[in-house]
Regions:
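Core Rossmann-like FAD-binding/catalytic domain of the broad FAD-dependent monooxygenase superfamily
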Residues: 1-350, 356-360, 368, 477-478
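Short loop/turn microsegments at loop-to-beta-strand junctions
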Residues: 269, 438-440
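Short, hydrophobic beta-strand segments that form beta-sheet elements in well-ordered domains
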Residues: 176-179, 413-419, 429-433
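Hydrophobic, well-ordered secondary-structure elements that form the walls
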Residues: 19, 415, 448
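Short, glycine-anchored, charge-dense loop/turn motifs used at functional sites
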Residues: 278, 441-451
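C-terminal helical "tail/cap" subdomain of flavin- and related membrane-associated enzymes
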Residues: 302-413, 417-423, 439, 451-457, ...
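Short, internal strand/loop/helix patches
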Residues: 149, 424-438
């Protein structure tokens, strides 16, 4: 029987990111993917600032940013604009980049790290005991692993086999998707139009193709199995935007109903779920791929500690505690966007737009929404009495001639102090940054969030609490 430390089910962005996070720490990982190959066409296309920061912290952002199309403003309602340039980050934007590009970059990194990605492997059974998990595959073979993570999408086999409830609802509004070429493309990048008949959106991929998205109320009774034609998508744009922008070729199309659901649990014993297997929602706000990648970043270092034998039980428990709350907030955010844009009552939609326009003219409210949309504002729970920085995203500060996120690319914990200090460990990076506004010492988790902040005298105990027993000394100092 083939045995690995962790079996990841699903080779989408969540599964690939998780595999990279595990393999870079020496964990034996195998990815089981039901599809025979990675697709070139996909529904997701937006990467937000926090996701780009995390990719940067693993040296995978540059290629995606170079090939993507930056969007610096988002208008959730007419007259209400979120200026993403205000975000305190190196990536003040939402980057239009097809999921297929992100998957190719992640897949290449996984291959460099020696990850075994097995295609055509469908999971049909799961059993676990106190030592590990056995997966049964459709071809009759089995896969044994210390831990299993289901990153296998909204119809997750892993979640189903665990018996985890996927609570929520299906939206009633049909969504039409098509990748098209335009003879008269809009000049304003991301282009959205609304009317009483629905909403249309054009997303530039930067290679001559555009993603055309339509919520057309006149076509809500069309069967989901009915193919989307070029004439149908053109008619929707003409009816709602009064132009079809000269739509010509169409290489792909789809019709679907989106859902708003979240798994009640993200873990059962040695088995976890992440990404769309744990949460699905309206595509408005472009949160899905981002939330999944961030799930993987949160879980990866924790699982690696468990495999290494020095993770205390609370470390693995914290994955569900932290990410379930984030997933619930994402569902609330996207459901709000859905009601604002696609609600059936014209009066209610109009009232919501008036309210959101007024609220976004209040700087504090606007910055809060920008933080939620971009992921910059995510904060994990902090213990009572902990420093206010605890649980917050650590900014990409300058550290001795380089950047913090560059120092984090080996996936270790990082101690940020105002002066050089030897903490006697090789598995923790020490970075020097002088800032009167920061505490004397800050311990940054591998996923870029503050684990602890306080006085240097407490460092040894704190590092031992988070990282396990002491390792041989030779930790680099920058």
């Amino acid at each position: 029987m083939n045995t690995v430390d962790v079996a990841v089910v699903g080779a989408g962005p969540t599964g690939l990111m998780l595999a990279c996070e595990l393999a870079m720490r020496g964990v034996r990982v195998r990815v089981l993917e039901e599809r025979d190959d990675l697709p070139n066409i996909t529904r997701a296309f937006g990467l937000h600032a926090r996701t780009l920061e995390l990719l940067d912290a693993r040296d995978m952002a540059d290629e995606i940013v170079e090939r993507g199309v930056p969007v610096r403003e988002v208008a959730p309602a007419p007259g209400a604009t979120l200026n993403l340039r205000e975000l305190p980050t190196r990536y003040p934007m939402v980057l239009i980049a097809p999921q297929s590009l992100t998957e190719r970059v992640l897949s290449a990194r996984a291959s460099q790290l020696g990850v075994d990605i097995a295609h055509g492997q469908k999971v049909v059974g799961l059993e676990q005991d106190h030592e590990g998990v056995t997966l049964r595959l459709a071809d009759g073979s089995t896969q044994r692993a210390g831990y299993v993570v289901g990153c296998d999408g909204a119809r997750s086999a892993v979640r189903t086999l665990l018996g985890i409830d996927f609570v929520g609802k299906q939206y009633e509004t049909h969504i039409l998707l098509a990748d098209v070429r335009l003879a008269r493309p809009p000049s304003d990048g991301l282009s959205a139009k609304t009317s009483a008949d629905g909403v249309v959106l054009l997303v530039p991929f930067g290679d001559g193709w555009f993603r055309a998205i339509a919520w057309d109320r006149t076509r809500e009774q069309a069967p989901l199995s009915e193919p989307v034609t070029l004439s149908e998508i053109r008619a929707a744009f003409l009816r709602i935007a009064h132009t079809d922008f000269g739509m010509a070729d169409m290489r792909w199309s789809s019709r679907f109903l989106s859902e708003r659901r979240q798994a009640k649990r993200y873990r059962v014993g040695r088995v976890f779920i992440a990404g769309d297997a744990a949460h699905v929602h309206s595509p408005l706000g472009a949160q899905g791929m981002n939330t999944g990648i961030q799930d993987a970043m949160n879980l990866g270092w924790k699982l690696a500690q468990a495999v290494g034998g020095f993770a205390q039980p609370w470390v693995l428990d914290s994955y569900e505690e932290e990410r379930h709350a984030v997933g619930a907030n994402v569902l609330k955010l996207t459901d709000g966007f859905n009601q604002l844009v696609l609600g059936r009552s014209l009066l209610r939609r109009a009232l919501r737009r008036v309210v959101i326009t007024v609220l976004l003219n209040v700087p504090a409210t606007r910055h809060m929404l920008e933080g939620r949309l971009s992921g910059i504002g995510i904060r994990y729970p902090r213990p009572r009495g902990a420093h206010p920085l605890t649980g917050r995203r650590m900014p990409d500060i300058d550290c001795s001639g380089t950047r913090l996120y560059e120092l984090m690319r080996d996936g270790r914990f990082t101690v940020v102090t105002s002066d050089k200090v030897d903490i006697g460990r090789s598995d923790v990076t020490v970075a020097v940054h002088v800032d009167p506004g920061l505490p004397a010492a800050v311990l940054v988790r591998p996923d870029g969030y503050v684990a602890w902040a306080g006085e240097r005298a407490e460092l040894a105990a704190v590092v031992g609490h988070w990282c396990g027993e002491r390792q041989p000394s030779t930790n680099p100092t920058y």
